[in-house]
């Protein structure tokens, strides 16, 4: 849904001009440019409006950018607002500045790419591309954990290569101990056009369909049965670089340790996970 924020810009230059003997009338209001510092899905972006701001009220509205707020400060020629990017696609995010009477001063649209996450592991680097269009709940949930650094220095604690072929993580530290900071569980997202094929990432959960929190798994082979088995498991992205790292995970030796079966005999560590796009 579009969001709106009303900005009352006071032009100090107009007051100065009048005091210096210049024209006492305010200069014509204009917005010559709207620039943005970053366009990462799910993250806060800052839009800077450049122009000539008088004491007229400006209506700034956005599409697919949530939580619009005015940045404190600014000058007589620049003002900034922030909001959180909420969609991906071509021209999907827009910002428009107009007068109270509806006169449009400037309208700009921006492209937003699918979010990507760089995951550094003890076996190498993996680059993930997520799909918020098909799986918004799972994508947003995963990115919240990524951006809070929850996954940094955690284990791939389960590698299964019989029946299903998965490498699961997002739960334990190398101690091992349960990583603190889990968020509320999310609803299951299945039948979204995504399948548990080799190289995809999906949410792990318990028998409760709506119990996924921080744990995820990589599909080390085609596991299409997981699309429907026990209600299905939600795929939300894929590996776009580093497939050899998943192959290396599939070849690790496992044991039973700490009450867990299929536990890697040597630690496989997620060193860091960072949203890059």
Predicted regions and their residues:
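Bacterial N-terminal signal peptides that target proteins for export
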Residues: 1-9
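Hydrophobic helical h-region of N-terminal Sec-dependent signal peptides
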Residues: 11-14
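Cyclophilin-like peptidyl-prolyl cis-trans isomerases
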Residues: 20-277
């Amino acid at each position: 849904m579009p969001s709106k924020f009303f900005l009352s810009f006071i032009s100090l230059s107009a007051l100065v001009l009048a005091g210096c003997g210049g024209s006492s009338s305010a200069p014509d209001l204009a917005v010559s440019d709207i620039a943005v510092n970053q366009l990462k899905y799910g993250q806060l972006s800052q839009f800077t409006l450049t122009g000539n701001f008088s004491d007229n009220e400006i209506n700034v509205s956005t599409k697919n950018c949530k939580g619009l707020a005015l940045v404190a400060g600014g000058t007589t020629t620049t003002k900034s607002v922030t909001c959180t990017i909420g969609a991906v696609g071509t021209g999907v995010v827009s910002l428009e500045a107009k007068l109270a009477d509806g006169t449009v001063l400037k309208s700009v649209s921006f492209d937003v790419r699918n979010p990507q996450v760089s995951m550094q592991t003890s076996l190498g680097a993996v680059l993930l591309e997520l799909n918020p269009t098909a799986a918004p709940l799972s994508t947003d949930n995963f990115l919240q954990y990524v951006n809070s650094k929850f996954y940094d220095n955690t284990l791939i604690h389960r590698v299964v290569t019989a029946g299903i072929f998965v490498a699961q993580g997002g739960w334990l530290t190398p101690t091992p101990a349960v990583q603190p900071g889990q968020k509320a569980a999310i609803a299951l997202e299945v039948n979204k056009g995504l399948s548990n094929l080799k190289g995809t990432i999906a949410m792990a959960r318990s028998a409760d369909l709506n119990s996924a929190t921080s744990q995820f798994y990589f599909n080390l082979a085609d596991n299409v049965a997981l699309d429907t088995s026990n209600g299905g498991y939600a795929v939300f992205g894929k590996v776009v670089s580093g497939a050899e790292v998943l192959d290396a995970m599939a070849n690790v030796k496992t044991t039973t340790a700490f009450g867990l079966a299929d536990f890697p005999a040597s630690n496989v560590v997620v060193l860091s996970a960072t949203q890059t796009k």
